[in-house]
Amino acid sequence: MAVIKMTDLDLAGKRVFIRSDLNVPVKDGKVTSDARIRASLPTIEDSLKQGARVMVTSHLGRPTEGEYNAEFSLQPVVDYLENKLSAPVRLAKDYLDGVDVAEGELVVLENVRFNKGEKKDDEALAKKYAALCDVFVMDAFGTAHRAQASTHGVGKFAAVACAGPLLFNELEALGKALDNPARPMVAIVGGSKVSTKLTVLDSLSKIADQLIVGGGIANTFVAAQGHNVGKSLYEADLISEAKRLLESSDIPVPTDVRVATEFSETATATLKSTSEIQDSEQILDLGDVSVARLAEILKNAKTILWNGPVGVFEFANFRKGTEVVARAIADSEAFSIAGGGDTLAAIDLFGIADQISYISTGGGAFLEFVEGKKLPAVVMLEERAKQ
């Protein structure tokens, strides 16, 4: 991957515009999971140490584009950064016509999605971003799959466009897992979005020795085996696709599950065979036999790619499956990569971050990279490196 690396540049006195992924969950004005900010911090700190005039921005949530909405403000991120850096951090709301930043100062530019044209990669907006800086640093792997004004367009017009350490390390780690993995390689694909992940399963079936499915995806495979899945989250129109994958790949479909009659934190979990599910029930977690089987598979793996929980781990009664899988990955000697927002939340919950070889900040970008798709931001950086 031929790109200009931020670590190869002298940033002293330069106006540096860093596009980070600071899209974190916020509740009552406080950041509730800081994994993405923590991952972005080394890039920010390195720029500050060099005496750069540092501007950092990100999107947060899904506000109506072009309209300010306090609910989606980056203020909670600013508060977090001030605390972590033990230094004042400014939040700039109106910055498109210029912002003054001192050497060694950090200014956070308000949510890029408050700017009209951000999502459409509007050229005029991209040029305004580019005019703010001497060096554009793309460090948001989590949004590298989106061609937007702050992730793609700005890089075309900035004097210098480079890859930040986080982005570069993400691409290297994923390359290591996908290009020449130590075997056996096990890929776990869970979560609720089935249709978006079936193409990923297809791609992974060609490189992984063993596929594992969980969550809503697993429910579709249970249905494909002819079982009633009741009110479970699944996609009926993808059953034939699931059958095709079952014929071509070794996928351990759950044989027992935890079900409930309502989707709530207080719902009672009932352990059942997949052949016994009633119309009124929904699958919210894997059963003990199914989970033990997965733990055994993971124990023998040499490379593990993990995207998505295997149950509704947010509810204590339906957490066991994801916890057993998470701890099996943590205890494994395999090179492990985990990615996706829900996966990061599970890693935080079980306190196993130090036992995962590499934690990717990307969700959609992680999946598109796994599928072998070209990420627009990376293509842009490669193009700029040739100029």
Swiss-Prot record:
- PROSITE patterns attached here? PGLYCERATE_KINASE
**Mind telling me which InterPro entries this protein's record contains?**
Phosphoglycerate_kinase (IPR001576), Phosphoglycerate_kinase_CS (IPR015911), Phosphoglycerate_kinase_N (IPR015824), Phosphoglycerate_kinase_sf (IPR036043)
Keywords in alphabetical order: ATP-binding, Cytoplasm, Glycolysis, Kinase, Nucleotide-binding, Transferase
Q: Where does substrate bind?
A: 21-23, 36, 59-62, 113, 146
Give the subcellular location.
Answer: Cytoplasm
Kindly state a single biological-process term from the GO annotations of this entry: glycolytic process
Task: Please tell me where ATP binds in this chain.
Answer: 197, 314, 340-343
Q: Which Gene3D superfamilies match?
A: Phosphoglycerate kinase, N-terminal domain
Class of this enzyme: transferase
Report whether Amino-acid biosynthesis shows up as a keyword of the record.
Answer: no
Catalytic activity, as annotated? (2R)-3-phosphoglycerate + ATP = (2R)-3-phospho-glyceroyl phosphate + ADP
Chief location bin: cytoplasm
UniProt family annotation: Belongs to the phosphoglycerate kinase family.
Q: What is this protein called?
A: Phosphoglycerate kinase
Taxonomy, top ranks, is: Bacteria, Pseudomonadati, Pseudomonadota, Gammaproteobacteria, Enterobacterales
